[in-house]
């Protein structure tokens, strides 16, 4: 269930960054192309996790807590991403991306507590943190 939510998060992120890259140029465009590519790679990791699901990695209280993660995504992440329209104002677009990245980090960090030995998930969390850092740096330079 939560890997499907993660797939949705990454797919929407890919589309958002792809659209931003089409509206920008130079270094800003390069960053958005890089972020889009990495979001697509994250989606591939989650697809593989779904395919290779190892139930022994999943904590016993998984079913009780999956509802919390789903609710978190529905309340915090998806309302921002449902409208995939990219704002014309680049600062608003970056600000929106920052919020989604922050919420994604929280979601994946909580997910990792139920799948504690998943290196792929930990790697994605670190990459999402780098996305956040890059976006904040970009916001400060505009």
Question: What kind of feature is each model-predicted range?
Answer:
Residues 1-142:
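Non-heme di-metal
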